[in-house]
Regions:
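Short helix-terminating capping/connector loops at secondary-structure junctions
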Residues: 43-48, 74-76
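Active/binding-pocket-proximal capping segment
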Residues: 24-25, 35-36, 56, 68-75
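C-terminal domain-tail junction helix/linker
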Residues: 106-184
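Active-site beta-loop-alpha junctions of metal-dependent nucleic acid enzymes
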Residues: 18-43
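RNase H-like two-metal-ion nuclease catalytic core shared by retroviral integrases
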Residues: 54-56, 63, 67-70, 79-104, ...
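Coil-to-beta-strand transition motifs
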Residues: 11-16
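Single conserved hydrophobic/aromatic residue that forms the stacking wall/gate
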Residues: 1-8
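Hydrophobic "anchor" residues on beta-strands that sit immediately upstream
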Residues: 51
Length: 184
């Protein structure tokens, strides 16, 4: 079975979440948005996702279903699309995608990975300090703005600086050696 990644970035902190999907469809994105809405609760979801900026991929072809809350008849967010061939409009996203490629080089298959593997990878990336965040990590910055309880709901864990690994061998299981993973 082919698996597809879905990432979402919180611009104020550069924290990125990533999810595996079993299809590259709008239904798979709606399922993730619904899950986030349920896990976070309406108030926190609305605070974190007032707007979703995305590309014009087919997985975002049903904006009304992404925008509306499934439990009550109201909108939970608003979808906006970047211009075609304009990745610079989501620059912070591209920086994190480059960090992902350090661990999973471009062209890597996600098919042997689990959500726990993806969460582990993102915990390492989100714990990596950035100059643009005044030498704080996305995890630390997000925690300052929104609190540890929200990070816990999102299955985010801080990785100590000395343990951060942004290399291919982080996910040894992917490369044929069984390993335990955290997160998920």
């Amino acid at each position: 079975q082919t698996l597809f990644p879905y990432t979402t970035l919180f611009r104020s902190s550069s924290l990125m979440l990533a999810f595996l999907r079993d299809a590259n469809t709008s239904a798979s994105v709606i399922e993730i948005i619904n899950l986030l809405d349920e896990v976070l609760g309406a108030k926190t979801f609305n605070s974190l996702f007032p707007v979703i900026l995305t590309d014009n991929g087919s997985e975002f072809s049903n904006p009304k279903e992404i925008e509306k809350r499934s439990t009550i008849p109201c909108n939970r967010t608003k979808i906006f699309y970047c211009d075609p061939s304009a990745p610079y409009q989501k620059g912070a996203c591209e920086v994190n995608h480059e960090l992902i490629r350090r661990i999973l080089p471009k062209g890597s298959s996600f098919d042997e990975l689990t959500q726990q593997d993806i969460t582990l990878m993102m915990n390492h990336i989100n714990s990596y300090k950035r100059k643009k965040l005044n030498n704080r990590s996305p995890y630390e910055t997000f925690s300052f703005y929104y609190g540890e309880d929200v990070l816990e709901k999102l299955a985010c864990r801080q990785v100590p600086a000395k343990d951060i690994m942004l290399k291919e061998n982080l996910l040894k299981k992917y490369f044929g050696t069984e390993t335990s993973t955290i997160g998920g």
